[in-house]
Each structure stands twice: as C-alpha cells, then as structure tokens.
Swiss-Prot record:
Residues 152-167, 432-443 have a biased composition (Basic and acidic residues). This is Protein PTST homolog 3, chloroplastic. Residues 359-375 have a biased composition (Acidic residues). GO terms for biological process: regulation of starch biosynthetic process; starch biosynthetic process. It comes from Arabidopsis thaliana (Mouse-ear cress). Interacts with PTST2. The lineage of its organism: Eukaryota, Viridiplantae, Streptophyta, Embryophyta, Tracheophyta. InterPro entries: AMPK1_CBM, Ig-like_fold, Ig_E-set. Contains a C-terminal (513-598) carbohydrate-binding domain (CBM). It is found in: Plastid, Chloroplast. GO terms for cellular component: chloroplast. Keywords: Chloroplast, Coiled coil, Plastid, Transit peptide. Residues 129-167, 359-392, 414-443 are annotated as: Disordered. Disruption phenotype: No visible phenotype under normal growth conditions, but leaf chloroplasts exhibit reduced number of starch granules. Residues 1-47 form a transit peptide.
Length: 598
C-alpha cells in the first residue's frame, strides 16, 4: 500500500529580496495560515501584493536597429545606403528611431548601415560553402548506403529494425563480428543472424537517408579500423591468442596478406601474418559449416575483397623504404634457415591439413635445389615478387578472393617502380638543391615585394575612393543649393510677370497729352494733381515757335481721361498761364487741364 508522506516546504518570493521596504511597510492584503496540531508537519502560505515594478524596455541590438533603418529607408523611398537624419525620422512618425539615432550618434548609425552590405556578402559566401559541403557529405553517405544495401535488400523484411541512433554502429559491429567468425562453424548461425540484422539496418538507413550523414561518417571510420573493435564474448571464449590491434599493425608492417581457410568436420583454422612469426588461431567447433545462404556468402566475400583492397592501398602508399637498402649478404645468410623453415611448414601442411604463410622478415625464397618444396608451398597460395627480387608467398582464401590478391600484386609493383624512380630523381636533384633553394628565396622576396606594392596600391585606391565620395557629397550639396536658388528665381520671375501683366492692363487706358507754355523765362517746369504735386516735369524749349523774347516750352504726358489742376514753375517761381483756363480756391489759383477719352 502506498503511503503519502507530508514533506514541509516553503515558498520564497525572489522579488521580495530586492523590495524589502515595500514588504515591510505595505500591509498584505491576504494572509492565509493553516495549522493542524494533530499532524506532524504544517503548511503555511503567504500572499502579498506589492507595487508593480517598472519594466525597462529592451535595448535594440545592432541587427534589429539596422533592419529597422533599412526598412524605413525602403518605405520612405530614400536611396539605398542613405542614413536618415532625426528630422526625417520624426517627419515620418518614427520618433523612437530618432531618439536612438540621437543617443547612439549619427556616425555610429552610418557605420552600421555601411557594414550591412559587407556582412550580407560574407553570409552569402558562407552559406554557399556550407551548402556545397552538405551536398558533398550527403551525396557520399547516400552513395555508400545505396551500394551496401543493394545486395542485402531481399532478406530485410524478415528481421526487426534497430533504433536510428544505434543502427549504423550496430551494423558495423555485426559486420565485424561476422567477418572475424567467418571460419568458425560453431558460430555459423550467429553469422547468419547478424547478416540479417545488417540487412534490416541498411533498409532503415536508406529510409532515413537525410538523418544519417553523421552515422555514415561513423561507419566509414569504423570500416577503416575494423580490427580495432572488441570481439564478441563467443570469440573470447574460443581462446583467441591474438588481438585485432596486433593484426592491423602486422598487416601495415608486412608486405603480404593471408586469409587461409580450411574446413573440416572438427575444426577451422584461421591464419594471419605477424611481424616476427606466424600465429595460428584454432577455434574448436562442435557443428559443421552450415552457411547455406548464397546472399550471405556473397556479402561476406564482397566485404572481404573490399577490406583487402583498402589494406593493399594503404600498404602501397606507406611502403617501407628500408627494403630498398637491404643487402645481398643478409639475404644469402638466411637461405639455409629459410629452406629448413619451408620443409617444416610443408610437413605440417601434409599432417594437419592447413598451410602457413611465409613472412616477409624470414625472406623465404624458393630455391632451385628444392623444387618440390617450392611447388608444395605455393600450391595453396600466390607467388609474389618485389622489385628487389625477394619473392613472397600469400595464401589465397578458399572463398574466391584471388582477384583481390592480383590487385594487391599490381599495386605493390607499381609502388615499387614509383619508389625507385623517386630515389633516382632525388639522387639527381641533390646537386641542384642549393640552386633551387636560392631561386625559391628570390621568388619569395619578389612575391613579398609585389604584395607590398599591391597593399600600397590598395591603400591609395581606398584613399581615392574616400576623396571621390567626399567630392560627390560636396557636389550633391552644391546641386541642392543651385536647385533651391533656381526655384526661388523662377518664383520671382513668375511674380514679376504677374505684376507686368497687371501694369499693362492698367496702362491700357492712358492718353497722350501735350502741354505748352509761352512766356519769358530760361527754365520752365510743370507739376500738378496728376502726380500729386510731388514731382516736377521739365519742359523743352521749342526754338521754332520762339519769337524774340517770347519763348515756348512743351512736354508730353500720358494721363488717364479726366480733369487735372496744373501749375508752371518759371525760373523757380510758381505761376499760372493766363492763356489757359484757371480755377481759384481762396488765395490759390491753378490752371485746368482736361483729358478726354477717345
């Protein structure tokens, strides 16, 4: 029966730590307490109301500020790259942006907008490179998974699927265990079961190909280090005297690779090379070899051939140069021991039924004096000779991997010829090495000088660019000023044209009037109510009409139709012409001028 235990607890309010005055001085609105004396523990709950704290607005980051400014420039129709001023922002209703520009500074906003273009270009380049890398990795993993799943697709529906996180690693471990247990008839049922699991795993990987790129890379790493993983408990129980790590080192150091199988009702033999001696792994079995599935054998052979090709490629790329420096006297001194070793191995093959390999360090060479031993030794293997005349014996697996061994021979011969040619080229190039070093140093100095010149030119170009930008800015300011002045002049011209038109309309009713004065005097002027008695109009002397002391003066005026009062000024005295009509008001008398409309 489940019991419920009462655990004491307390509720703390973090906000009260920073607002102790309000906790002390504000009376709580609600106080609830529940005390039960009969129970061991009690529960107390406090509820208190405090003043709402002031929430400070979040400060906008540079990216947000830049995006808002770019949006404002686009919406306002301003040119791209233009930095809006506080006046422009306020005019368009963005007072918040105007305050931010005022606080952070116009120079900072300008640099922020200017750097946006460069960051966009860098982001595009980075995005393109990431897309290319993703496509390459996805394509490689997809091709690897498709190749490995074509041969295993027929039996995949019979088995359950593993989880996605463990599918690739489980497939690798199952494939390693089935490969290491290939010659064990006692574990044949386990190999078949593991192969079926691999088939279901491969189908799951194909179905989830987009989520398995990392798992495919794990598969590639484990396939290169196949023998580095720990073997299954069944193999450990079989008294395996050699670890997989030693097998990898032996294959990398030795020139030959041996996979020798011999099937018998009682035992299976697996032979692998070692740097110092040949080691045998005898696994006792209690059942016959019952791998009857053709697909299983085909998959194992394909995997075995692939591993042989990989090891041959690694071996051909990292061949030991010490074989080139071997001497004939060492080779001749080991002939006798090699012959006895071949005899012992031949006898062992006849008695026990399995064939040992001849290691590279023993330098076993078929002798003309022992043709029978040579033929018996090479009966179950391939004869391989290197560029130095040192033949090797490589056992051929009984499951049909002779083609892979031929590829190993071809790769080894090509590597030996390339190594010899490289050595000859190196011996020839020793004499010219100082010359090449001198040329290399001179080229490096020239490259450094060119780089320095390039940097100087780039600096000059950047300065010229800045100067051009400044000139463009000043020219744009002058252009705006000129446009403003032109607009003002155009407005003034339009106003004057209106005034001129009005003046023409007002002058359309003027009449031409000729005023004459005859009398004695030297200078005569006329004034009157037509100009407000303010301006005096000089009169010209008419010599044709003057007779003796009687002189005549005349002038031409443009006046509107009506009656005007005029007066003549003769030698500075205001007088009236007695020959014209006059009017008297009080003590003042003036001549009358009448203008009739036509």
């Amino acid at each position: 029966m489940a019991t419920i235990s009462q655990i004491p607890f307390s509720i703390s309010f973090p906000c009260f730590e920073f607002r102790k005055p309000s906790f002390y001085y504000h009376q709580p609105q609600l106080f609830v307490s529940y005390l039960n004396s009969t129970k061991k523990h009690s529960f107390i709950c406090f509820a208190c109301s405090t003043k709402q704290t002031r929430v400070r607005k979040r400060v906008k980051s540079n990216e947000e500020l830049r995006s808002e400014i770019m949006q404002f420039v686009a919406l306002a129709g301003l040119p791209e790259g233009h930095v809006p001023s506080m006046k422009e922002l306020s005019a368009h209703g963005r007072v918040d942006l105007a305050n931010i520009v005022r606080r952070r500074g116009y120079k900072f906003i300008k640099e922020l907008v200017a750097n946006s273009g460069m960051e966009e270009d860098c982001n595009e380049l980075v995005a393109d490179s990431e897309d290319n890398n993703t496509n390459i990795e996805t394509g490689g993993s997809r091709a690897c998974l498709e190749d490995s799943s074509t041969d295993l697709s027929k039996e995949a529906e019979k088995q359950g699927s593993l989880s996605k996180d463990e599918s690739s690693l489980a497939g690798v471990l199952s494939l390693e265990n089935s490969f290491s247990n290939l010659g064990d008839s006692n574990h044949s049922g386990e190999i078949t079961e593991k192969i079926f699991k691999i088939e279901s795993v491969e189908l799951n990987e194909i179905a989830d190909i987009e989520n398995s790129s990392s798992e495919a890379s794990v598969f590639a790493n484990h396939s290169q280090d196949l023998y580095d993983t720990s073997s299954c408990p069944d193999i450990e129980a079989g008294n395996v005297s050699m670890t997989e790590d030693e097998e990898v080192n032996d294959v990398d150091k030795d020139f030959s690779l041996t996979f020798d199988h011999y099937t018998s009702p009682t035992s299976n033999h697996y032979t692998s090379p070692d740097l110092n001696s040949i080691k045998h792994v005898d696994i006792a079995t209690g059942s016959s070899y019952d791998l009857t599935s053709e697909n299983t054998m085909t998959n194992v052979e394909n995997f075995q051939n692939q591993q042989i090709d990989d090891i041959a490629a690694n071996r051909s790329g990292s061949a030991d140069d010490s074989l080139v420096e071997s001497e004939d006297n060492d080779w001749m001194s080991g002939l006798s021991s090699c012959t006895s070793s071949i005899e012992e191995k031949t006898t062992r093959f006849i008695q026990n039924g399995y064939l040992d390999t001849v290691g590279a360090d023993e330098n076993d060479i078929p002798n003309e004096s022992c043709p029978e031993e040579s033929s018996e030794t090479t009966k179950g293997g391939e004869y391989i000779g290197d560029s130095l005349g040192g033949p090797r014996i490589m056992s051929t697996p009984l499951n049909g991997s002779a083609l892979a061994l031929k590829e190993i021979i071809h790769a080894t011969e090509v590597n030996s010829s390339d190594r010899n040619s490289d050595q000859r080229d190196g011996s020839v190039g020793l004499d010219t090495d100082p010359h090449h070093e001198t040329r290399k140093r001179e080229n490096q100095v020239e490259i450094d000088r060119l780089r320095f010149m390039l940097d100087q030119k780039e600096l000059e170009l950047s300065r010229l660019k800045e100067q051009i930008e400044k000139e463009k800015l000043s020219l744009s300011v002058l252009q705006r000023q000129a446009e403003t002045e032109i607009q003002k002049a155009q407005m003034l011209i339009s106003e004057k044209e209106v005034e001129l038109q009005e003046a023409e309309e007002s002058l359309s009713g003027l009449q031409e009037v000729v005023i004459e004065y005859c009398g004695d005097g030297n200078a005569v002027e006329v004034t009157g109510s037509f100009n407000g008695w303010q301006h005096r109009v000089g009169m010209e002397l008419q010599a044709s009409k003057s007779i003796g002391k009687q002189k005549c003066w005349s002038t031409l005026l443009w006046l509107y139709p009506g009656t005007y009062e005029i007066k003549f000024i003769v030698d500075g005295q205001w007088i009236t012409d007695p020959q014209k009509d006059s009017v008297t008001r009080g003590h003042i008398s003036n001549n009358i001028l009448k203008v009739d409309s036509q």
